[in-house]
Amino acid sequence: MRDGKELKPCLSGRGVTKVFGFGDAKTVAVDHVDFDFHEGEFVSIVGESGSGKTTLSKMLLGLISVTEGEIDFQGKPRDISNGKKKKEYWKGIQAIFQDPFASLNPRMTVEETIREPLELSGKVKKGELSDETDRIMEMVGIDERLRYAYPHELDGGRRQRVGIGRALALDPAFVVCDEPVSALDVSIQAQVLNLLQDLQEKSGVTYMFVTHDLSVVKHISDNICVMYLGQLVETTTSKELFDRPLHPYTKALLSAIPSVDIHHQKQRIILKGEIVSPIEPKPGCRFAARCPYATEKCHQPQELREVSKDHFVSCCRVEEINS
């Protein structure tokens, strides 16, 4: 719901699971995740390394297969069963990667990089390619004088602008942003985040922003989903998550955000215990081994349930802990 209007799901998933390996060495990277990313939303996926954020992103992009579950795109079951259908799917869903230097072809100029998806898609007439390339360069703030520059001649911020321009060239409905600012200087991070927001307001694109840094997404996200070892443990609006975190893991993440407030340091939650193995995990809460509130019933299967309006938590003791 935004401005009183019900938003349609852009990308949805039910029971989405990814298992690597076989036999007795199966690693459950993403475990029966349900989600709805609505049109025009800025949704952030946060969690530590190994939480399954990037694996989920790759499944949504069609870069790796889904072991179990269903994904719908723009209200229809996703079909990427062959190369032609996958190419058509990629016209509507694109990615902005973490390292702009590694994600750009070092032998292609700025103009060639942005022009390539326009040529391959066939959406733009040959005679209009140059004008459309100019429009996209201006849209993402790339100076005309850099048209023939190569990636190694650009700084990190400009390289990422090229990556953003390439991703948005085909006017996709959904864009996966895989830690797009983590490799940039702090001053440049703000510029890139502002650019992403401005482009979203103009185009209505849906963002899935993957990061391990909650402080980055606080002011830009509509909703935030917290992942831990392949499972969603909490999802709600950005304001609600920062004002009233309910899951013990979310509280620990928020307490780790650096602050100039000396009193904040005293509230830091230090997690103890061992991280459970994702190889053939046992039923129950994956966080139980590190949770200070864990009891026997935490080792029973958990489900992500709505504990207040639009606030979902996977914890059987959430009411007791937060009473």
Where are these regions (language model features)?
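Short catalytic/signature loops enriched in Gly
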Residues: 2-9, 26, 235-323
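Helix-to-loop junction immediately C-terminal to a conserved catalytic motif
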Residues: 61
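Conserved ABC transporter NBD signature motif
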Residues: 69-79
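Conserved ABC ATPase "signature" region
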Residues: 128-145, 254-255
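Conserved ABC ATPase signature
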Residues: 150-154, 158
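A short, proline-enriched helix->beta-strand linker immediately N-terminal to the Walker B motif
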Residues: 169-173
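P-loop NTP-binding/switch modules centered on Walker-like glycine-rich loops
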Residues: 176, 180-184, 188-266
